Regions:
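N-terminal Rossmann-like NAD(P) cofactor-binding subdomain of oxidoreductases
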Residues: 2-188, 193-195, 280-283, 318, ...
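Short glycine-rich or small-residue beta-strand-to-loop segments that form or flank ligand, phosphate
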Residues: 4-7, 138-139, 230-232, 289-292
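C-terminal active-site/capping subdomain that shapes the small-molecule cofactor and substrate pocket
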Residues: 232-327
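Alpha-helical scaffold segments in soluble metabolic enzymes
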Residues: 17, 21, 150, 154, ...
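Conserved active-site and cofactor/substrate-binding residues in soluble primary-metabolism enzymes
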Residues: 13, 122, 143-150, 197-205, ...
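Residues in well-ordered beta-strands of folded domains
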Residues: 34, 128, 167, 217, ...
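Contiguous C-terminal substrate-recognition/catalytic subdomains in enzyme active sites
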Residues: 182-276
Length: 327
């Protein structure tokens, strides 16, 4: 019997990407498509290719309460923080509303007081290769946090924690579908700009997983999708590659590249895979760990479906895109 799915906030980029994977999944069946802005409209209002294939959009509250086995919440952070999880459903939240266990961090990093702070302890952080989800309430990691943690978490005990810098660059889809000046073509094209320097909300998420803070500097790339995080740190002992090999041995999603091979944006775009590589800086002896992934794939929707698969006891890669199409 198929597993029923509701998507809350299906009209945004993350929601669209989740929908695409649900439709390709052999065990999942769409029950409700939620969007407050498109409620009552046919699915073709989102994408003409969906004309006549799917149920019409309903308000997000109806999609949430539709009784689906799995709910994917693709809402802005503050709206997702107010969600009342349906009983017995697996709920995967793609926002940052439940990634931080400490309620005191939300005003500083997200700009709001958490409306349901007592519920935070019930959520598990789901980065499958490193922190498999436990329970039915799953906080899907952020895109920068995913890349940084895939690069750093396996070797965190081998690094000087005061030395870690994450230099990350992402495509404009990471800013969401709603138009804004910083994602306008006139600003983005032929440009490379750092943003939220020292204040990005994924920094405390990374700290919570690693146990120490990192200097995170995100940049906006003039591409639609994809993310590369280059992580620099002073190693305290040898054996970093062995730790990475152990972490990703047998993984169908995260590929540790051969020595000397660099991760590339083009190989991970439109996929749910990630590439990781380790280098040594000849001049300083610093370790350099690079991770490339698609911010909408492994950095959002692909990881959400992977988390749902694990929570359902299914093969983790069902419904995922694990190979790009060369051009």
């Amino acid at each position: 019997m198929a597993v029923s799915v509701s998507i809350v906030g299906a009209s945004g980029y993350a929601g669209q990407e989740v929908l695409d994977r649900v439709l390709a999944h052999p065990e999942l069946e769409l029950l409700a498509l939620g969007s407050d802005s498109l409620a009552g409209e046919p699915a073709a209002a989102l994408d003409l290719r969906l004309d006549g294939q799917l149920p019409p959009f309903v308000p997000n509250t109806i999609a949430l309460a539709a009784g689906a086995d799995v709910v994917f919440a693709c809402l802005p952070h503050e709206r997702a923080a107010s969600l009342d999880p349906p009983h017995d459903s697996i709920l995967v939240d793609l926002s940052g509303a439940h990634r931080l266990a400490d309620r005191a961090l939300y005003p500083t990093w997200y700009g709001f007081e958490h409306p349901r702070p007592d519920s935070l302890a019930a959520w598990s952080y789901g980065l499958p290769e490193l922190f498999p989800p436990a329970g039915r309430l799953i906080a899907n990691p952020g895109c920068y946090a995913t890349a940084a943690l895939l690069a750093l978490a396996p070797v965190a005990g081998f690094l000087d924690p005061r030395s870690v810098v994450v230099d990350a660059k992402s495509g404009v889809s990471g800013a969401g579908r709603e138009p804004k000046a910083s994602s306008h073509a006139g600003f983005v094209l032929e440009n490379l700009a750092p943003y939220r320097v020292g204040t990005h909300q994924h920094a405390p998420e990374i700290r919570g997983a690693l146990g120490f803070p990192v200097c995170l500097v995100p940049h906006l790339l003039p591409v639609r999708r994809g993310l590369v995080a280059t992580c620099y740190a002073r190693p305290t002992e040898d054996g970093l590659r062995g730790r990475l090999e152990e972490a990703y041995a047998g993984s169908a999603v995260v590929r540790l590249l051969p020595q000397g091979v660099t991760p590339e944006l083009g190989r991970v775009q439109q996929t749910d895979a990630a590439e990781v590589a380790l280098f040594e800086d000849r001049a300083t002896g610093h370790a350099i760990v690079v991770c490339a992934l698609d911010n909408l794939g492994k950095g959002a929707a692909g990881q959400a479906v992977q988390n749902a698969n694990l929570a359902l006891g299914l093969e983790p890669t069902l419904g995922l895109r694990l190979a790009g199409v060369p051009v």
